[in-house]
Each structure stands twice: as structure tokens, then as C-alpha cells.
Amino acid sequence: MATNNFEALNREDKKNLIAEAGRVTDITDPKWGHPDGRDFWYIDPALNIDTATLYNPEVSDEEKMALGTKRQAAYMEQWWNTEHSCTCEKYMVPGCPEEPDTECEVWVIKPKNIKPRKNRVLFYIVGGALVSLNPNAYPIEKLCEEHKCVGIVPIYRLSWQAKYPAAINDCHAAYKWMVDNADMLAIHPNKVVLSGSSSGGHLALATGFRLKRYGYDPRGIVTVSAQTDDREKDGPSNYSGVWDSVEQHDGLLQYMGRNFASNKVGPEAMPNHATVEDCIGYPPVFMHQSELDPDILNNIEFYTKLLKAHSFAEYHVYGGAHHNNGLFSVVKGVGEPNEYSMLVGKIFDTNLEDCFRYDLRRPWVVEEYKAAFKEKFGE
């Protein structure tokens, strides 16, 4: 590992963090990248200092609250100062059954090309390391226009506001409100696809388990670079400067609190906490992942659980890419589009459209599992 970057991990302001030689792989050199994905490869961590501060375990909760509130207000102001091709309506909706007294803000994005009623729905969960939520960073309006669907965007609580399960409760509240108000929103509750990138993908997959527990049955889930586990189990870690193994560790520690890396919490916290049995009856999934994402091996493990549970699952891994480089410029606005990123964007769009067009759910798997259980153990 390059000396300067290795020392950066062990510097004084990262107290109690030790990165031992041979345990971290330095991937900051663009040579690691696919030739069409080397732009936006290494970002000086100093440019990301506000984000890192919000999940730095050495920073007080009071400091995080002050910085996070200021930063979030700027993001929302940025949204409203942007030119829009869709209308955006904001609602405050009741809390979910597990936290009924806590309202959640929900945005409803409506393009001009939707039908008067019974529209498809893109339930889009914005990413941002669970410490920031910037709808401008993702092409939500573009996706709604291209797929002729209504966008539902939960403005969930961030980890410096409330720890797990607050964000999942908010996503649950938004989904329940959407289904309960389907006619008013001119949507079809049986044609809802969840999606999100990074922590948005993590929350989309985790929300899938919450919805399954409550009897909801979304059409599918399409994610990009989702985090699936907070337990570091396999091999050395990667260092890229922004949302690498160090950043992900601190970000998930901030979100999970005392439940961090604990087997006492299930897949509604982190999807790969699921057992194979938990995955039976899970919605169809399309996962897009970078080869050098910090928890790529955990994500592959989660994918194999879906296969063992006979859920519809498709997994795309892109070589020469890490969490935030230009490979995903079309999907989540990182860098400038190139041939490789346009191909990724096309596959992503195809997966969304497949969820809308085809019913890929497998209800018979649940029935066969129940029958087999009954045959083996009786009533």
C-alpha cells in the first residue's frame, strides 16, 4: 500500500483506527480502473470532509446535528433552485405501525407523460451514506419520464438524526401511505418497483424484508452498489479515499449504533443478516455492483441466499470499478458519461422495465415451502 495513503488511515484525527500492513489494499491509482471508467477515480478525502464528519465516531452528536441540519437544508434548497421537468408534491404522512407517532415527509414526482390513473411507481430511496440525502444527485425525474411512472421518494431520517430502525420505519411509512392512497396518487399498487444506489440500495433491500413481513409484495427491487452487511468477514479491505472499507465501517457504525455487526438484528437492518429461509418469498432482485466495492463478497453471499431461496435474482458485477467512479455516471450522476457507463445505464434501465413489464414474482415457492414444512413436521 502506498505509504502516504496508509499513513492517512492511521493519522491522529482518526483516533483508535488502526490499519495494519497487509490488511488494506490501496486502489487509489487509476490503473485499477477499466479504461472507460478511470475518470472520477480518486477524490481527495478532504473534499468529502463534511460527509466523513457526520459519521466520525470521534465527533459529538451535537456537532453532527448542527452540521447535518445545515448541510441538509442546503441540499433541499439546491433541489428547489433547479429546473424541473416533472412536478413535485410534498406530503407529511403518518408513521408506520412500529412508530405511528413519527411522521415522514414523502415527495411525489409526476412527469407529464403519465396516464390519468393506474400508473407504475418507482419507489426511489436516495443514497448518501445514511448521513445526507440529496435528490439532485440522482436522475429521479429522468427515470420517471423514461419509464412513464410516478416517483415516490421518502425523505427518511438520517443516522445523525436517529439510528436504526428509523430510516426503515420511514420507508415503511411512505410505502404504506402510498398503497393506502393509490387512487389519489393515480397509481397501481401492484406495479411498484423499489430502487436506490449506495445506501439507498441498502435501504431498498432492507425495506423489502420489512414489506414482506407486513404482507406487501412489490414488483421488484433494482439496486446499485448497495451495502448488505456491517460484518467484515472476508479478506483484506480496500482503500479508495471515498466510501471505501474505512468509510463504510464508520458510516454503518453511526447508523447501527450498539447493534453494529450484531447477529441479534436481522435483514431489516442489513440484508445479508438474512437466512435462506428469510429470503423465501422475497421480491425479484436485480443488483448492480462494482468489483472493488468494500463489501462485494458479502453482497455475493446475499445473492447466493436469494438463489437458494429460489427467488428471482440477477447480479451484475462490473470489473475495474469502485463505489463512486465514472462507471455509474448515467445511473447516479458521478462523473461524465462514457461508453462503459452508458452500457451500465442501459442494463439498469432494462432491469427496471423488466420489473414493470413482467411479473417475476414466484408465489408458488412460498406455497411449496409451506407444503414441504407441513409434510415434514405436520400441522
What are these regions (language model features)?
Residues 33-94:
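An N-terminal hydrophobic leader/cap segment in hydrolases
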